[in-house]
Amino acid sequence: MLESLIFSLNSTMPLFFLMLLGYLLHRRQFLTDDFVAMANKFVFHVALPVQLFRDLATMDVRASFDGPYVLFCAAATTASILVIWGLARLFLKDKHIVGEFVQASYRSSAAILGAAFIQNIYGTSGLSGLMILGSVPLYNIFAVVILTLESPSQDARSGMGEKLVKSLKGIVTNPILLGIAAGFVWSLLRLPMPAMANKTLSSLAGMTSPLALLAIGAGFKGRAALGYLRPTAVATVIKLILLPAVFLPVAVQLGFVDQKLVALMVMLGSVTTPAGYVMAKQMGHEGTLTGSVCVTTTFFSALTLTFWVFWARSQGYIL
């Protein structure tokens, strides 16, 4: 139990400290609002697409593919998104935050934490790629659609047909989805990755998380966040507790245990990804609610992930 807690703290608290550093540097005017805007733009258009491309391109999709598992990841992701979206439209009084609330409630840091968690427990991270394949493309497709249809900007309050066309265009031209598609094709074709290219891409990919986290901290508006305490708390509970509580027992009944179950823990119950904040900002949303949920899920996930690992180990689902 203590070992799991220490690992969870080591995995999540550095993310929180980077956000805190960004906030303090902004208060001291080392990081400006212009830096936040440019960092968000760079992560969205360059660093994150490169990271996802490299993660998929260097994975042997053919050798490790497990159709039922990938299908379960996709089904759980789709079901959770649609239910959260429907309930948010029904119960959120402030319709301007529906898009941010939905994305912050479902979108995990699967690509960043998945491999690290599995590797720490089993010494290999091979099955994290299957979870990423079944969830991350859907994360981004739904994010484009939801953030477009629920945009608070005036020009988005047009006819449904125009909104759907805009969503489709957003999916086709989204740099994150283009990176995923390119990486998947590269992996399927089993193309070699030249050492020079791999090192260059690795350097760019390594900038994704630090830049995004610094930007979240630097762009965090404390007073504005106070106005979103209730939706922040609800989104945090959904992200860290409700989604794992619903889908992990189902996964066990279907026979997904050991590495596959650990990957699902990350997919369902890890921190809200900083990429969600970047995408929300780039698509015309305020970003305050998303940033708040990133902070709270990062802070509390060390405890909740430890609980889920303890539960699975005590039941003999992971060894």
Task: Give the ranges of each region predicted by the language model.
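Alpha-helical transmembrane segments of multi-pass small-molecule/ion transporters
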Residues: M1-L319
